[in-house]
């Protein structure tokens, strides 16, 4: 292939890639009273089959796309970089080290069972537990969650993770030091309750 032809071909591929990557998909704003189709179905061209649908085991965008479609975490990050409430309707912190999250009322699992703060505690403890062998076991430690690193390294029990349920709808997370990125880090797919 001639250098000029190769350059044009490469530029064409790059342009096509940029155009594909820049198209955003957004959920529709459906006005109240709108009659929806009887069958609600999401079809996603994901490129390949997922290796796992366990949020603590996934490692690729293929799985992350599906996890994001199926699960919600405490917060999400908008395309503009703003923290948005998801399972948590509000939160406050003391000295940027003790964070209290108040779960939205009425959040439920697919079987209708309420999602509680204890479900989140159990999920995060499972994430850091070396027995789970999660590729993201070190993530809570990176977030500066109390005992996260020691648990992932097998030095402490998962139950010592700095997260506790105050009641069914209130979660408290204790950090070892302030972390300016903490709220944004909560949007990671490995932190969704399971």
Spans of features found by a protein language model:
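Surface-exposed binding/hinge segments that line
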Residues: 119-121, 128, 132-194
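Immediate post-signal peptide segment of exported/extracytoplasmic ligand-binding proteins
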Residues: 30-43, 168
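Extracytoplasmic/secreted proteins, especially bacterial periplasmic and envelope-associated proteins
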Residues: 65-69, 82, 86, 98, ...
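Gram-negative bacterial Sec-dependent N-terminal signal peptides
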Residues: 2-26
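Aromatic- and charge-enriched surface segment that lines or borders ligand/interaction sites
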Residues: 89-139, 172
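Second-shell loop/turn segments in exported
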Residues: 56-58, 103-111, 159-161
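N-terminal lobe/hinge region of extracytoplasmic solute-binding protein
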Residues: 45-95
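Soluble periplasmic/extracytoplasmic beta-strand elements of cell-envelope proteins
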Residues: 41-45, 100-102, 162-164, 172-174
């Amino acid at each position: 292939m001639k250098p000029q032809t190769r350059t044009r071909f490469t530029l064409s591929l790059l342009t096509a890639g940029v155009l594909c990557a820049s198209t955003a998909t957004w959920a529709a704003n459906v006005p109240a009273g709108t009659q929806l189709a009887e069958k609600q179905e999401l079809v996603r061209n994901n490129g390949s089959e997922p290796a796992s649908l366990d949020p603590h085991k996934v490692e690729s965008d293929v799985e992350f796309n599906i996890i994001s479609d199926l699960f919600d975490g405490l917060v999400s990050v908008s395309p503009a970089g703003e923290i948005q409430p998801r399972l948590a309707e509000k939160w406050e912190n003391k000295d940027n080290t003790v964070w209290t999250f108040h779960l939205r009322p009425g959040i439920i699992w697919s079987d209708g069972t309420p999602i509680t703060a204890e479900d989140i505690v159990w999920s995060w403890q499972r994430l850091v537990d070396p027995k789970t062998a999660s590729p993201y076991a070190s993530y809570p430690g990176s977030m500066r969650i109390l005992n996260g690193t020691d648990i992932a390294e097998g030095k402490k029990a998962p139950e010592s993770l700095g997260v506790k349920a105050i009641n069914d709808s209130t979660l408290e997370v204790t950090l070892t030091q302030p972390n300016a990125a903490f709220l944004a880090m909560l949007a990671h797919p490995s932190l969704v309750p399971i």
